[in-house]
């Protein structure tokens, strides 16, 4: 994350805001992001602010618009996908959130994206739990079960 901060200490509000967001203190983060000068707002910071708006103010339309704008400005940063997905989740759009997380993983396999997608996935139990998931027997029987049930 050090690439988005100025070396002369001007990025401290941004650093503290991102840290507060990741620790779950979105109210403090939103307050910190509102103090950041518009010229210092990168797409990443804008996406974090959008997530804070969604969780604290419940203004989902504004948060989605802001996060989508951030993604359009920088499609290469996986944390922007993470924050857009979080906004979709907060708004109740689970399917859109999972699609966004998957797009972010295609961009870069970031651990936070992987963890979030894994926590949302809804895989069924394996037919033969004593075998590995990749075992052909589990795969074939699993596919048969999915067509029957």
Region annotations inferred by a language model:
Residues 69-96:
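Mid-chain, well-packed structural core segment of small domains
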Residues 122, 127-129, 148:
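Long, ordered, amphipathic alpha-helical scaffolds
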Residues 14-22, 27-79:
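Alpha-helical adaptor scaffolds
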Residues 89-125, 138-139:
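TPR/TPR-like (Sel1-like) alpha-helical repeat modules
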Residues 61-71, 98-102, 130-140:
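Alpha-helical repeat scaffolds
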Residues 1-12, 24, 142-149:
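Long, contiguous interaction/recruitment modules in multidomain scaffold/adaptor proteins
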Residues 1-12, 35-40, 127, 132:
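TPR-adjacent "capping" and linker segments in tetratricopeptide-repeat scaffold/adaptor proteins
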Residues 48-50, 83, 116-117:
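Canonical tetratricopeptide repeat
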């Amino acid at each position: 994350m050090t690439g988005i901060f100025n070396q002369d200490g001007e990025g401290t509000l941004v650093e503290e805001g991102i840290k507060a967001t990741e620790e779950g203190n979105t109210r403090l983060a939103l307050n910190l992001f509102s103090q950041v000068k518009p010229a210092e707002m990168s797409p990443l910071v804008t996406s974090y602010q959008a997530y804070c708006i969604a969780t604290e103010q419940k203004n989902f339309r504004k948060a989605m618009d802001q996060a989508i704008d951030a993604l359009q400005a920088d499609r290469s940063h996986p944390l922007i996908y993470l924050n857009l997905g979080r906004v979709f989740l907060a708004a109740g759009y689970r399917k859109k959130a999972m699609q966004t997380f998957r797009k972010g993983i295609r961009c870069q396999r970031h651990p936070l994206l992987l963890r979030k997608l894994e926590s949302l996935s809804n895989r069924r139990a394996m037919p033969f739990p004593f075998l590995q998931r990749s075992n052909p027997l589990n795969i074939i029987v699993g596919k048969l079960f999915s067509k029957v049930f």
